[in-house]
Amino acid sequence: MTQAKQSIPALYDFIKERQANPVAGSYTDYLFTKGLDKILKKVGEESTEVIVAAKNPDDPAFILEVADLTYHVLVLMVERGITVDQIATELASREGKKSRLQERSKIEKY
């Protein structure tokens, strides 16, 4: 994928293509070969890195970490057989709905 700007659906399609047609030595192939547990570990690591980066004023570092997390979540989605359209449908189903904020437990500041 060589576009200067990648869309999330295009990246998803690229990852899905790599799953179907592995390229030896590619990181995506490595993740699929290692399986779900490795992919989950990477999603967890990247989530933590996003949180840490968000606490700092360095926007480029935060952007990099969000991009890494997005990539790994898309790999997880492909591994699980979940499509971008399914996520978009779920998000659309929430549009205009009343918040259940009152039902959620209060988040205390640390």
UniProtKB/Swiss-Prot annotation:
Q: Which reaction does it catalyse?
A: 1-(5-phospho-beta-D-ribosyl)-ATP + H2O = 1-(5-phospho-beta-D-ribosyl)-5'-AMP + diphosphate + H(+)
SUPFAM superfamilies for the chain:
all-alpha NTP pyrophosphatases (SSF101386)
Tagged with keyword Transport: no
Q: What keywords sit in the KW lines?
A: Amino-acid biosynthesis, ATP-binding, Cytoplasm, Histidine biosynthesis, Hydrolase, Nucleotide-binding
| Pfam families, per database record | PRA-PH
Concerning its family, UniProt says: Belongs to the PRA-PH family.
Give a Gene Ontology cellular component term annotated to this protein.
cytoplasm
Pathway membership, UniProt: Amino-acid biosynthesis; L-histidine biosynthesis; L-histidine from 5-phospho-alpha-D-ribose 1-diphosphate: step 2/9
Q: InterPro entries under this entry? A: HisE, PRib-ATP_PPHydrolase-like
Q: So what EC number does this one have?
A: 3.6.1.31
Protein source organism = Lacticaseibacillus casei (strain BL23)
Give one GO biological process term: L-histidine biosynthetic process
Disulfide cysteine pairs (residue numbers): none
Could you tell me what this protein is called?
Answer: Phosphoribosyl-ATP pyrophosphatase
Q: Give the encoding gene's name.
A: hisE
Q: Which GO terms describe its molecular function?
A: ATP binding; phosphoribosyl-ATP diphosphatase activity
Which leading EC class covers this enzyme?
A: hydrolase
Q: Where in the cell is it found?
A: Cytoplasm
